[in-house]
Amino acid sequence: MPMLPPVANALKRSETGAEETSEQDAVKRTKVLDMAQKVTRQIISSANAPGAIGPYSQAVRAGNTIYLSGSLGLDPKTGDLKEGVVEQTHQSLKNLGEVLKAAGADYGNVVKTTVLLQNIADFAAVNEVYGQYFKSPYPARAAYQVAALPKGGLVEIEAVAIAGEIEEVKN
């Protein structure tokens, strides 16, 4: 019998529990699994946010999930960093907002962010600005101090969002 992916191996037995032996059945099953696993991929970009400064996209939508690359506090018109961590945080989040808009989403669609800080002592100042863009229920988040950020940035924020209408479920 041909080697199948782990998911297909789990489906190797018939409803009665007897193992299927037909190679044709295995091929059919593999084709069905391949069709179920296909996901559309779309590159998202906005002229209203700074272009990528390396070989990557501003965002990629895979199925209903939108992955936004890290955003520095760069002015989209000049490419210059804003002054100070507060202004860089505002600009980083504005840039993310423009890319979200290009994807047909907004801050309410964001489910996860990662905040990279050049200095963890800026955590409170970044939180103050962050709370102006994201409202409760807040996205999941991680924040880290890093040794350095591109272009001498003080903060970089990346995000993951879900396309479409979000229905909140109360616990």
From Swiss-Prot:
It comes from the Eukaryota. GO terms for molecular function: deaminase activity. NCBIfam families: Rid family detoxifying hydrolase. InterPro entries: RidA (IPR006056), RidA_CS (IPR019897), RutC-like_sf (IPR035959), YjgF/YER057c/UK114 (IPR006175). This is RutC family protein C23G10.2. It comes from Caenorhabditis elegans. GO terms for biological process: mRNA catabolic process; negative regulation of translation. Belongs to the RutC family. Residues 1-25 are annotated as: Disordered. One of its GO terms (cellular component) is cytosol. It holds the Pfam family Ribonuc_L-PSP.
